[in-house]
Amino acid sequence: MGEQPIFSTRAHVFQIDPNTKKNWVPTSKHAVTVSYFYDSTRNVYRIISLDGSKAIINSTITPNMTFTKTSQKFGQWADSRANTVYGLGFSSEHHLSKFAEKFQEFKEAARLAKEKSQEKMELTSTPSQESAGGDLQSPLTPESINGTDDERTPDLTQNSEPRPEPTQNALPFTHSSAISKHWEAELATLKGNNAKLTAALLESTANVKQWKQQLAAYQEEAERLHKRVTELECVSSQANAVHTHKTELNQTIQELEETLKVKEEEIERLKQEIDNARELQEQRDSLTQKLQEVEIRNKDLEGQLSDLEQRLEKSQNEQEAFRNNLKTLLEILDGKIFELTELRDNLAKLLERS
């Protein structure tokens, strides 16, 4: 085509599953450039998208097409020529709305272009149709007569306005035998011509059917060649689009590399956190082991403390018994001392008396 794209955007491309007519089949692994083109040679608008060198969308916009938004970021349209339904997934609702606006705009432009083309065809074909109509009226007239003058009159009424003249001239013809024989011969000639025309018409009808079949085959082959030519033209005409697409891919790759770098830094940070967590886990395990050892040591000390408490209690009991014994001995000694004191006093008194 050679034209530059009128409008371009990026989207994920899908086609309806030809078997189920329900599921979407992706035709691109990633988002690709989808462009509107104007084909000035054929006066049509096209939607074209390439995935590398392969044309995954080559749709001619017609007035009866409709672009339908099925969600906030997805839209679709049916292409009867390609016998499929295309679907586009956009990155945002804004891109979807912009594409839908352009679709409606170019659809209206296609309708106006079609109307202008039809008007031109009607203007150019009207004189030839009139001349062809005039040529066909004469052979069809004998077929409509079917052998009688009464049946020829309505046919003449359709093709010419001076209707009363045959009726006025028919009166003198009925009174003239010579003229009657002339008309009989003319009628026989017309019947023969009618039979020949009928046979020719049947043969022409058969030929027309054959020609229609051949024409359909030629049209199908022409459409296939046209699609192939369009694909080749797309490959050659979209060099700039491919360059733009390459630039966009490089930019996307750069963005992905930056994103990858950020992700790698985040992964390093997470690794560091994991190492720290492992160190904390090791410290926790070490402290847990030490705590268990301390608990075991504590149990041992508790056992020793219990033993010492028992021994202390036993010692205290022994000391208490010893004290009680000493107290008893002291009481006995006190009694003995008291008795000795009394004995001394008594002895002293006895000495004094003697």
Swiss-Prot record:
It comes from the Eukaryota. The modification N-acetylglycine is found at G2. The modification Phosphoserine is found at S306. Residues 181-352 form a coiled coil. It holds the Pfam family WH1. Residues 290-354 are annotated as: Required for tetramerization. GO terms for biological process: G protein-coupled glutamate receptor signaling pathway; protein tetramerization; regulation of dendritic spine maintenance; regulation of store-operated calcium entry; regulation of synaptic transmission, glutamatergic. SMART domains: WH1. Disulfide bonds: none annotated. GO terms for cellular component: cytoplasm; dendrite; dendritic spine; neuron spine; plasma membrane; postsynaptic density. Keywords: Acetylation, Cell projection, Coiled coil, Cytoplasm, Phosphoprotein, Synapse. The WH1 domain interacts with the PPXXF motif in GRM1, GRM5, RYR1, RYR2, ITPR1, SHANK 1 and SHANK3. The coiled-Coil domain forms an antiparallel tetrameric arrangement. Tetramer; this tetrameric structure is critical for forming the high-order complex with SHANK1, which in turn is necessary for the structural and functional integrity of dendritic spines. Interacts with GRM1, GRM5, ITPR1, DNM3, RYR1, RYR2 and SHANK3. Interacts with IFT57 and OPHN1. Encodes a coiled-coil structure that mediates homo- and heteromultimerization. Interacts with SHANK1; forms high-order polymerized complex with a mesh-like network structure, at least composed of SHANK1, HOMER1 and DLGAP1; the complex formation is SHANK1 multimerization dependent. Interacts with NFATC4. This is Homer protein homolog 1. The gene is HOMER1.
